[in-house]
Amino acid sequence: MKELILETRIHVHAWEELGEEDRQLADAAIEATHRSYAPYSRFSVGAAVRLANDLIITGTNQENAAYPSGLCAERTALFYANSQYPDQAVTALAIVSRPSDSSSISEEICPPCGACRQVMLETEQRFGHPMKVLLCGAKNVFIVERASHLLPLFFGSDALK
C-alpha cells in the first residue's frame, strides 16, 4: 500500500502585517458584507477579487427561500469578474463574514465551500495564473498562495479528456 500525505501551506497574519494591496482587498470584502442578502441565515459574506489590471470586483452571498437557489459571495464575485472582464486574470480573492446583526466581522475565518473552491480552481486554471486567497477573520488573516492549494484532489478540465 502506498500512502500520500497532502499538506497545505497557510500563512497566518495579524491585520497589521498585511501589505497595502492585501489590506485594500480585505477592506473591500468587509464593505461588501453590508450589501449581502441573508435574511434566512443572518450570515453575511463578502468577497473581493483583484484582477490583473488591479480592478477590484466585489460580491456578496445572495440567499433565496428556495434553498439551494442562493449563491455564495465568492462565486458572485468570480462569475461577475469573469463575465465582464474575460481577459483579466483574477490574481487574489479575499473572503470575510459577519453576523448580519453586527457591524463587526466574524472572529474566525470563513473558508469557502466546496463549490466555491471548484470555481476558484477553474478560474485559476483558466488564466494560468495563481490566485492568492485571503481568509479574513477578526483574529487574523489566513493567506494561501494558490486557490488550488485549498482543493488538493480536484476535478479539473484534464479529467474530461
Language model region names:
Residues H11-H13, H34, H129, H149:
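Histidine (H) residue identity feature
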Residues S44-L51:
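Short beta-strand scaffold segments in enzyme catalytic cores
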Residues D27-H34:
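Short Pro/Gly-enriched beta-strand edge/turn motifs at strand-loop
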Residues A38-S41:
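Short loop/turn motifs at secondary-structure junctions and domain boundaries
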Residues M1-D27, D101-S103:
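Short, compositionally biased leader-like segments
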Residues T58-A159:
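Zn2+-dependent cytidine deaminase-like catalytic core
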